[in-house]
């Protein structure tokens, strides 16, 4: 089967590089599936999982926003933060989730609720990817 080169890159460096058969990601416009030979496009990404299919295996990468650039022979994901499922520290993600939930429940005026909501979404996404809840 044909493959497409995929790179997931953050400001800290590359997170994932491989040839895959299909890339699925959650864009702001909805779920995207990219196969080899796809028309060129750029799409802003939501916080979510990028699914990378190779044969019968699917690898997951948690991304916290960014952009997906598609060319016929390559997909590049430029993410603010990204982690492979096996690299996620579950205890740290649970602690971040609990911290964000406490901040949201406190309802104090000095708390940036939008930032706390984003932190909660990122933590839940990391836990879902680590536990393969997709």
From Swiss-Prot:
Q: Which NCBIfam families match?
A: ATP_synt_epsi, PRK00571.1-3, PRK13446.1
Alphabetical list of Gene3D superfamilies matching this protein? ATP synthase delta/epsilon subunit, C-terminal domain, F0F1 ATP synthase delta/epsilon subunit, N-terminal
On subunit structure and binding partners, the annotation says: F-type ATPases have 2 components, CF(1) - the catalytic core - and CF(0) - the membrane proton channel. CF(1) has five subunits: alpha(3), beta(3), gamma(1), delta(1), epsilon(1). CF(0) has three main subunits: a, b and c.
What keywords would UniProt list here? ATP synthesis, Cell membrane, CF(1), Hydrogen ion transport, Ion transport, Membrane, Transport
What Gene Ontology cellular component terms go with this record?
plasma membrane; proton-transporting ATP synthase complex
Q: Which family does it belong to?
A: Belongs to the ATPase epsilon chain family.
User: What Pfam families does its record include?
Assistant: ATP-synt_DE, ATP-synt_DE_N
Q: How does it sit in the membrane?
A: Peripheral membrane protein
GO molecular function list: ATP binding; proton-transporting ATP synthase activity, rotational mechanism
As for subcellular location, the record says: Cell membrane
Task: Please describe what this protein does.
Answer: Produces ATP from ADP in the presence of a proton gradient across the membrane.
Chief localization? membrane
**Protein name (database record):** ATP synthase epsilon chain
Q: Would I find Transport among this entry's keywords? A: yes
């Amino acid at each position: 089967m044909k493959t497409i080169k995929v790179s997931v890159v953050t400001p800290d460096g590359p997170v994932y590089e491989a040839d895959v058969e299909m890339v699925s990601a959650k864009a702001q416009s909805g779920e995207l599936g990219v196969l080899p030979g796809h028309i060129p496009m750029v799409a802003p990404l939501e916080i979510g999982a990028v699914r990378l299919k190779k044969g019968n295996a699917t690898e997951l990468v948690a991304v916290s926003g960014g952009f997906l650039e598609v060319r016929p022979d390559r997909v590049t994901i430029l993410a603010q933060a990204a982690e492979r499922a096996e690299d996620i520290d579950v205890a740290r993600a649970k602690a971040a989730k609990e911290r964000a939930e406490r901040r949201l429940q406190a309802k104090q005026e000095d708390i940036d609720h939008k930032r706390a909501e984003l932190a909660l979404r990122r933590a839940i996404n990391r836990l879902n990817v680590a536990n393969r809840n997709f």
